[in-house]
Amino acid sequence: MREIVHLQTGQCGNQIGASFWSTISGEHGLDSTGVYQGTSDLQLERMNVYFNEASGGKYVPRSILIDLEPGTMDAVRSGPFGNLFRPDNFVFGQSGAGNNWAKGHYTEGAELVDSVLDVVRREAEACDCLQGFQITHSLGGGTGAGMGTLLISKIREEYPDRMMATFSVVPSPKVSDTVVEPYNATLSVHQLVENSDETFCIDNEALYDICMRTLKLPDPGYGDLNHLVSAVMSGITTCLRFPGQLNSDLRKLAVNMVPFPRLHFFIVGFAPLTSKGSHSFRSLTVPELTQQMFDAKNMMAASDPRHGRYLTVAAIFRGRVSMKEVEDQMHSVQQKNSSYFVEWIPNNVQTALCSIPPRGLKMSSTFIGNSTSIQELFKRVGDQFSAMFRRKAFLHWYTGEGMDEMEFTEAESNMNDLVSEYQQYEIAGVDEEVELDDEIET
């Protein structure tokens, strides 16, 4: 079957990853040690997309856990799902990257990368038909950003024809974890533009907003944020893991979502967003799901789709949903909001259906949008980058690890190019219409 190899790097990547594995273990009826306790054959049918079957009826995640310091890995190992993972798949250094992209990409990370690739090869060789890789990491730190992008480029080199999907936590507008975040993020985007096939952008601030505004949680913690991310990750891969009427996989998703190779940065969303206790008090309908799914407030990245236009959209519905109803809803969204979709891609919404809902819900939908408004996010990081880079602030930490200023300049201009490409396609197609109007009047 179409296996996916999962990598999680750095503190953020490992925490999101741990949350993701607990979510999909539950969906497939596995307990915290990987023993199958489920009731339905459907849970077993495509278990091997993410799990290897081990002796004694245990299932082991095809997951590789990577960090440059042992702390986060110890936390995962001692957590509720610590016994799920294969012990050989924990690869960690001792020194840490100290939020320094250069350490993750060139010095500390480069020393560890070969032992990670050995584990990647071992996992890939055990697959029947490897579909691709997915990696969870953040772009603001040292390990997830620096070493994460190093791994992506190494895997790209070795498996050029396999899909590479990344779940990347991008820096937030107001909440900054580290001062050098803009540097790390810009250097990472520079890599992702070239080496990733699809990048799902997530940011903490948008997640906080959802937790507080929609879920009414008084003080959300990282556990709540990671829960939202894992819901989306589970939704995106649901068609691979369960039979459905309209199946999609990483490659089909990319073919439908990426009109130009560099523009593969997606905004994601999920519906229904209900707090843990309240979802039993309302019934869900497809129109409600669709409305919530397209609602700008529920996007998990801080860029407002109303400020741009959608190039393409994918909607993945789960549960007992009528195919016709979904098609009608999607059609009506495009009709009513046609100004928010580019007119030079006629049917730019792709739908997929899967008959098995997530745990505790009757139906759900996952939203993936390739919107030109994502440029806001890159623009914001770029402005912060150039403000610091103009003064060469903090640069010695990077040049001390052997980096050159030239690399910073290249990364900056690559990101500026990306922003202007998004701008160009946002207004493309409008110009021709203006000329047509003139002709009609004459």
UniProtKB/Swiss-Prot annotation:
Pfam families: Tubulin, Tubulin_C
Annotated GTP binding sites: Q11, E69, S138, G142, T143, G144, N204, N226
One function term, GO molecular function aspect: structural constituent of cytoskeleton
Name of this chain's protein: Tubulin beta chain
Binding-site positions, Mg(2+): E69
Gene name, Swiss-Prot/TrEMBL: TUB-B
Family: Belongs to the tubulin family.
Source organism of the structure: Pneumocystis carinii
Gene3D superfamilies for this protein: Helix hairpin bin (1.10.287.600), Tubulin/FtsZ, C-terminal domain (3.30.1330.20), Tubulin/FtsZ, GTPase domain (3.40.50.1440)
Keywords: Cytoplasm, Cytoskeleton, GTP-binding, Magnesium, Metal-binding, Microtubule, Nucleotide-binding
Task of the protein: Tubulin is the major constituent of microtubules, a cylinder consisting of laterally associated linear protofilaments composed of alpha- and beta-tubulin heterodimers. Microtubules grow by the addition of GTP-tubulin dimers to the microtubule end, where a stabilizing cap forms. Below the cap, tubulin dimers are in GDP-bound state, owing to GTPase activity of alpha-tubulin.
GO cellular component, one term: spindle microtubule
